[in-house]
Amino acid sequence: MKMFTLLYLLTVVPGILSDVQLQESGPGLVKPSQSIALTCTVTGISITTGNYRWSWIRQFPGNKLEWIGYIYYSAITSYNPSPKSRTTITRDTSKNQFFLEMNSLTAEDTATYYCAR
């Protein structure tokens, strides 16, 4: 089920919302025990548009993917149980952005982080 959800998040149906773009920004590197704050800016659609989940995923060295969590168009959040206690996803609808904050990072959090719809 997790793989299906991830594939769905990464799939864009041709011709539907094809002009939607997501751009991550934040610090390149952080040290263990520090926190990270990432921003995803969405263009081409409002993040309050119905029935969309705005997600954060990460890709570990070796290409393993992990879903971190999402914020629903209605601001409901859901998290992967693994990093849940250290993770917060929020949004700013006035800027059409959503955010990932993770605390108490360890070497095991080394990954490339992506936002996705």
Curated annotation (Swiss-Prot):
GO cellular component, as recorded: extracellular region; immunoglobulin complex
Keywords in alphabetical order: Adaptive immunity, Disulfide bond, Immunity, Immunoglobulin, Immunoglobulin domain, Signal
Disulphide linkage map: 40-115
Entries under InterPro entries matching the protein: Ig-like_dom, Ig-like_dom_sf, Ig-like_fold, Ig_V-set, IgHV
SUPFAM superfamilies: Immunoglobulin (SSF48726)
Gene Ontology annotations of biological process type: adaptive immune response
Signal peptide: 1-18
Domain called Ig-like: residue spans: 19-117
Top-rank taxon: Eukaryota
PANTHER family named among the record's database cross-references: IMMUNOGLOBULIN HEAVY CHAIN (PTHR23266)
Name assigned to this protein: Immunoglobulin heavy variable 3-5
Species whose genome carries this gene: Mus musculus (Mouse)
Annotated gene: Ighv3-5
